């Protein structure tokens, strides 16, 4: 692997107002205070834009952070950004997120996750300063796979949602560009990311909003779902470590590039039962005074069948990440949900 020192480098982060993107920008500045970070985000209204503005306001304190409001599906804009800033490292986190939303709004996924990612790849191809492209894939690429834990060595050609299909497509497109144009690229399959200032469409956040309003929360597959919940700080720690080590460029016996390409899982290697997760969340919401001590959780829970596009379990095998980067996520669920509950109490008071 080629080591990259992020100090004094120009780094482009797409989806910079997003949950992972904004936390990544903060982590980059901890790692490399003299870096220049260009953030792009279309600030779409898929969920409350006030959350995105809150995250951006937290990034305003960094003098070398520049925010560009725009869409990665806008090829002219992306081309101009790359020509102007000449990034050394690109982290593509911009994407239309959410499995269930992809069933009713497929066009948004094609625009952002396919056309947008293609524009990033094309810009990387023509960017002489580029040392590493890192991009978000997803645990959803494992689809209906039965073998757990999920390993990056497993076949992943059974997506159960369009979202998953677009993420697998990103890996294939990146592989082709790595092979054709010798672009070092690393895809990261994130597992159920959660934490403060997250996405309201994620279970922990959506459940909290509903419980606060006295509404009933629906627990899918009658509670027989397990998720490898991964705390956002652990995710961005993994991303920064990966950014600093790019797959090596080398040629094969045929004289053509061996694709400088890699894919890793970033997950907690600890699937939690959804009912246990709801129990811990409820305890932490009471502790943070988001909900009263006498709140009747049983009266606000409804067990319902599995949703289309969902899978019963996600479980990350992170042995490759540990081997190559000496890192594995370690934040336990209670600690992470406590941090979320305390943030929620403050943000919505």
PLM segments and residue spans:
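The catalytic Tyr-centered alpha-helix of NAD(P)H-dependent dehydrogenases
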Residues: 159-166, 190, 196, 200-204, ...
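Amphipathic coiled-coil/heptad-repeat helices and related helical stalk/stem segments
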Residues: 52, 74, 203-204, 235
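C-terminal substrate-binding subdomain of Rossmann-fold SDR/epimerase-dehydratase oxidoreductases
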Residues: 27, 31, 211-349
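N-terminal Rossmann-like NAD(P)+-binding domain of SDR-like oxidoreductases, especially those catalyzing
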Residues: 1-193, 272, 279-280, 313, ...
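Short coil/turn segments at alpha/beta junctions that flank glycine-rich nucleotide-binding fingerprints
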Residues: 180-184, 200-201, 246
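Proline-centered turn/helix-capping motifs that create local helix->coil transitions or kinks
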Residues: 134, 143-147, 182, 198, ...
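A glycine/serine/threonine-rich, flexible loop-to-helix segment
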Residues: 148-149, 200-208
